[in-house]
């Protein structure tokens, strides 16, 4: 219900959404849609997702008070159907697990992973870049409060 992002990987359709319409509580399901049976299977929770190769990358950012956040990262192998609860980010700065993650993108040319964090009115957001293997590379300002999209040339 209430989809936010749809991605096709290996002829499979993945839908990340809110799971409900306001004012009902959001459940943020990430679902695999079966085009033949027109059914969905929930593979986990997520507020952002991206894909590269055979992998679906998912970030799930949760909060109870809109001040303190907890973010987890996982992958889903689109060929085997296996979900790995282990974060795909190595040596990630603490801000990525305690901040409000607003962006998750993968560069289609080299697999580099970009994660954006917003601080809302407190200042510009930050973008964290990781190599395709999850190794941390750098942090840079997003140029605005809520980094929510990347364009790769």
Feature annotation, model-predicted:
Residues 1, 35-45, 82-96, 135-141:
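A short beta-strand motif characteristic of beta-propeller blades
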Residues 23-64:
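Long, well-ordered mid-to-C-terminal structural blocks that present hydrophobic/aromatic surfaces
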Residues 95-134:
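C-terminal structured domain segments
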Residues 14-16, 57-60, 115:
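Residue position within the beta-strands of beta-propeller blades
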Residues 1-9, 43-55, 59, 96-106, ...:
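Repeated scaffold domains used in trafficking and secretory/extracellular systems
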Residues 19-20, 62, 119:
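Residue-level signature of beta-propeller blades and closely related beta-rich strand-turn architectures
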Residues 1-31:
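Solenoidal tandem-repeat scaffolds enriched in leucines and small polar residues
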Residues 22-31, 65-75, 122-128:
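Structural motif
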């Amino acid at each position: 219900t209430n989809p936010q992002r749809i991605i096709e990987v290996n002829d499979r359709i993945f839908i990340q959404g809110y799971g409900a319409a306001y004012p009902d509580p959001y459940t943020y399901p990430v679902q695999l849609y079966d085009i033949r049976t027109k059914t969905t299977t929930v593979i986990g929770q997520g507020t952002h997702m991206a894909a590269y190769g055979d992998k679906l990358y998912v970030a799930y950012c949760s909060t109870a008070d809109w001040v303190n956040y907890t973010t987890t990262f996982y992958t889903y192998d689109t060929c085997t159907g296996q979900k790995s609860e282990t974060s795909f980010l190595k040596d990630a700065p603490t801000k990525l697990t305690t901040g409000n993650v607003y962006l998750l993108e993968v560069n289609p040319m080299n697999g580099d992973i970009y994660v954006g964090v917003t601080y809302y009115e407190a200042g510009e957001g930050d973008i964290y870049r990781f190599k395709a293997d999850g190794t941390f590379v750098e942090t840079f300002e997003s140029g605005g409060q809520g980094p929510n999209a990347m364009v790769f040339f």
